[in-house]
């Protein structure tokens, strides 16, 4: 069952004071709230410690109304010696709704130094679903990662190297103990050497747990009469953990080669360019987005299951992350075509609708994420007869993939060099530099990092033996304007129907594994028509001869477990040579091929996974907090099949 998220509540007492069962009485005085937050900044020594750093990461147990984040952001903005990129990771079991957060921080309007930041936070506030939510401010230089869920669980799943901790002291039936021994052990797991902390808790049990896990502890008195602040740093006397927190890949220059200019590759280009990398993008076709990313439109939605399995959590994270990135592109002037009326996923049977209802009830998601429609509601929404109800995703829909790619390349600006009509025959490595080489042996580009985003050809270029991709032929059909009834929004089920801006209806698509024939087939059009006529009776009217219909053939490359391949590629040769020692290995134990990453195997979900995959790779390269929980990072790890072979002693 999923970890159902319960929001904090807010009420106003008779004396006008805002109170919350989860947080008690909320601050009324902006200056006092700011002073309280600034004590935490001073206690962790931030202004001195983030000077000249590329990135600096703060982890907070308990976000509340965001006061400490807003004060930290203001201090960062005011400091000319600040770090280049500030990461703030906050755990919150009971986040406020957007409107309650607006009310809760209303007292900050009087503090002009942070009121603008508060407005930006409220505008970016994410949907109330569990997991990690990444928000960017100040052109991406301030990054807030909100971990919605229980503190102990979320910290154990967090992949980060923390430079400082703000330790809340909220202990209630609603929050549990946010400074339990388990929580403190999880903090020690992600602490960088010398990481500092500050807390208002003076519980001796907390002090003991901190000292037992490698933190020092001392009290700092406050001259203004406030209670003493407990501070310290991570300075273990002996090695206390099996795996060290992630570090940035050491490179002589922030340069990368990305091979493949579809959804996966263009997303990587944009995310690396945003961090100051220079990229050579190599595409074998004359234009970007020429394979599956060249379809007129693609549907975009998350999956939902009652048990909230890996696929559900991954697609939810990808869906929300893509929405945030696309809004950022549009705000920066790089708009592209996408529908804005939501999307309906119709059930294929009564049993299928029951499964949808169970998944909907289990997650308890808000209506801005998903709504359940019975048959009558679905019929009214679509103004068409339907056999069953389904799920309405108000922010789902259809997107023009090539437009997304073009927007991402435009956002990268001068940091990307495109080599179109260029095919990479092989990769060569000389010390710390990768070279992309053509069939004649000429060097096309060189860099310390290569990201393979070229779908089916990635396995060949990387020489992988333990990642298998399968091509799946997909033929879509275009129905001419006037041949169908109006369809208010994209609709999917067994097949899909997408209204395009010019009145054309896009329907599809066939699913033909191991078929690599690019020829358009009449039988494919017939199959697509039959599916959509069953899905939406009454949608399709009289048609011209099927042989005259237009369409497109493209190929999705899928992995056996239907989960993408994202992250650093394993050094398979070294792993095989040490197979016996690695038979019980975890993903973090496996040797990696330095500087070689993969972003492929996206199948039919490139729109959902591409932006998230790009952010994951960029974060891994930079040693930043990852945008996914550990279990999900492991699920997309390119080495997962090698790990299974090692554990099954199929190697060696």
Curated annotation (Swiss-Prot):
Pfam family, one: DAO
Family annotation (InterPro entries): FAD-dep_OxRdtase (IPR006076), FAD/NAD-bd_sf (IPR036188), MnmC-like_methylTransf (IPR008471), SAM-dependent_MTases_sf (IPR029063), tRNA_MAMT_biosynth_bifunc_MnmC (IPR023032), tRNA_S-uridine_synth_MnmC_C (IPR017610)
BP-aspect Gene Ontology terms: methylation; tRNA wobble base modification
Record EC number: 2.1.1.61, 1.5.-.-
Subcellular location: Cytoplasm
GO CC, alphabetical: cytoplasm
Cofactor entry: FAD
Tagged with keyword Endoplasmic reticulum: no
Top-rank lineage group of the source organism: Bacteria
Entry keyword set: Cytoplasm, FAD, Flavoprotein, Methyltransferase, Multifunctional enzyme, Oxidoreductase, S-adenosyl-L-methionine, Transferase, tRNA processing
Catalysed reactions, as listed in the record: 5-aminomethyl-2-thiouridine(34) in tRNA + S-adenosyl-L-methionine = 5-methylaminomethyl-2-thiouridine(34) in tRNA + S-adenosyl-L-homocysteine + H(+)
tRNA (mnm(5)s(2)U34)-methyltransferase: annotated segments: 1-235
Annotated region (FAD-dependent cmnm(5)s(2)U34 oxidoreductase), positions in chain: 259-652
SUPFAM superfamilies xref list: FAD-linked reductases, C-terminal domain, FAD/NAD(P)-binding domain
Any one Gene Ontology molecular-function term assigned to this protein's record: flavin adenine dinucleotide binding
Transferase found in the keyword field: yes
Similarity comment: family membership: In the N-terminal section; belongs to the methyltransferase superfamily. tRNA (mnm(5)s(2)U34)-methyltransferase family. In the C-terminal section; belongs to the DAO family.
PANTHER family: SARCOSINE DEHYDROGENASE-RELATED (PTHR13847), TRNA 5-METHYLAMINOMETHYL-2-THIOURIDINE BIOSYNTHESIS BIFUNCTIONAL PROTEIN MNMC (PTHR13847:SF283)
Function: Catalyzes the last two steps in the biosynthesis of 5-methylaminomethyl-2-thiouridine (mnm(5)s(2)U) at the wobble position (U34) in tRNA. Catalyzes the FAD-dependent demodification of cmnm(5)s(2)U34 to nm(5)s(2)U34, followed by the transfer of a methyl group from S-adenosyl-L-methionine to nm(5)s(2)U34, to form mnm(5)s(2)U34.
HAMAP family per UniProt: MnmC (MF_01102)
Protein name: tRNA 5-methylaminomethyl-2-thiouridine biosynthesis bifunctional protein MnmC
Species for this entry: Burkholderia ambifaria (strain ATCC BAA-244 / DSM 16087 / CCUG 44356 / LMG 19182 / AMMD)
Gene, per the UniProt record: mnmC
């Amino acid at each position: 069952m999923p970890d159902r998220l319960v929001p904090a509540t807010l009420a106003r007492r008779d004396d006008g004071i805002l109170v919350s069962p989860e947080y008690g009485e909320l601050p009324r005085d902006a200056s006092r709230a700011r002073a309280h937050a600034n004590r935490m900044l001073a206690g962790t020594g931030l202004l001195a410690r983030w000077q000249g750093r590329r990135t600096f990461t703060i982890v907070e147990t308990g976000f509340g109304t965001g006061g400490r984040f807003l004060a930290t952001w203001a201090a960062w903005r005011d400091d000319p010696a600040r770090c280049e990129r500030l990461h703030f990771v906050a755990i919150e079991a009971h986040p406020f709704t957007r409107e309650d957060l607006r009310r809760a921080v209303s007292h900050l309007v009087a503090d002009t130094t942070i009121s603008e930041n508060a407005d930006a936070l409220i505008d970016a506030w994410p949907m109330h679903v569990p997991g990690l939510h990444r928000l960017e401010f100040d052109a991406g230089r301030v990054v807030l990662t909100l971990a919605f869920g229980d503190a102990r669980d979320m910290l154990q799943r967090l992949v980060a190297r923390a430079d400082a901790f703000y330790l809340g002291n909220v202990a209630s039936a609603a929050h549990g103990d946010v400074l339990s021994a388990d929580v403190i052990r999880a903090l020690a797991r992600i602490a960088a050497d010398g990481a500092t902390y500050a807390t208002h808790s003076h519980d001796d049990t907390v002090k003991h747990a901190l000292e037992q896990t490698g933190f020092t502890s001392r009290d700092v008195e406050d001259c203004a009469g406030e209670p003493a602040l407990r501070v310290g740093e991570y300075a273990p006397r002996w090695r206390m953990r099996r795996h060290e927190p992630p570090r940035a890949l050491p490179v002589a220059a922030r340069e990368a080669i990305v091979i493949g200019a579809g959804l996966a590759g263009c997303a990587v280009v944009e995310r690396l360019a945003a961090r100051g990398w220079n990229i050579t993008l190599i595409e074998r076709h004359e234009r970007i987005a020429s394979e599956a990313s060249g379809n007129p439109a693609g549907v975009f939605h998350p999956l939902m299951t009652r048990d909230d399995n890996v696929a559900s959590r991954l697609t939810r994270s990808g869906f929300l992350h893509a929405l945030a990135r696309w809004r950022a592109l549009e705000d920066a002037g790089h708009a592209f075509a996408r529908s804005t009326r939501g999307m309906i996923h119709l059930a294929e049977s009564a049993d299928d609708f029951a499964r949808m209802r169970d998944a909907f009830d289990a997650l308890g998601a808000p209506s801005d994420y998903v709504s359940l429609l019975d048959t009558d509601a679905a019929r009214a929404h679509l103004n068409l007869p339907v056999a069953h109800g389904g799920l309405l995703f108000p922010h789902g829909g259809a997107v023009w993939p090539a437009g997304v790619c073009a927007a991402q390349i435009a956002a990268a600006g001068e940091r990307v060099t495109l080599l179109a009509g260029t095919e990479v025959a092989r990769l060569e490595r000389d010390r710390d530099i990768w070279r992309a080489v053509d069939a004649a042996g000429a060097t096309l580009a060189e860099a310390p990092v290569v990201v393979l985003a070229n779908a089916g050809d990635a396995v060949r270029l990387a020489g992988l033996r333990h990642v298998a991709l399968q091509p799946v032929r997909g033929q879509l059909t275009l129905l001419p304007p006037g041949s169908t009834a109006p369809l208010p929004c994209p609709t999917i089920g067994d097949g899909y129907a997408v209204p395009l801006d010019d009145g054309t209806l896009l329907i599809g698509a066939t699913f033909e594994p191991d078929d690599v024939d690019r020829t358009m087939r009449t039988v494919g059009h017939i199959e697509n028509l039959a599916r959509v006529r069953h899905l939406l009776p009454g949608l399709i009217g009289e048609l011209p001869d099927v042989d005259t219909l237009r369409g497109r053939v493209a190929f999705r490359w899928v992995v056996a477990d239907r989960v993408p391949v994202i992250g650093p590629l394993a050094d398979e040769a070294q792993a095989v040579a040490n197979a016996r020692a690695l038979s019980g290995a975890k993903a973090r134990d496996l040797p990696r091929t330095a500087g070689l990453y993969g972003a492929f195997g996206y199948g039919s979900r490139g729109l959902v996974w591409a932006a998230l995959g790009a952010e994951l790779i960029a974060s891994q390269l930079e040693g930043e907090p990852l945008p996914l929980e550990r279990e999900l990072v492991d699920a997309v790890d390119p080495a997962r099949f090698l790990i299974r072979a090692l554990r099954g002693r199929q190697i060696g």
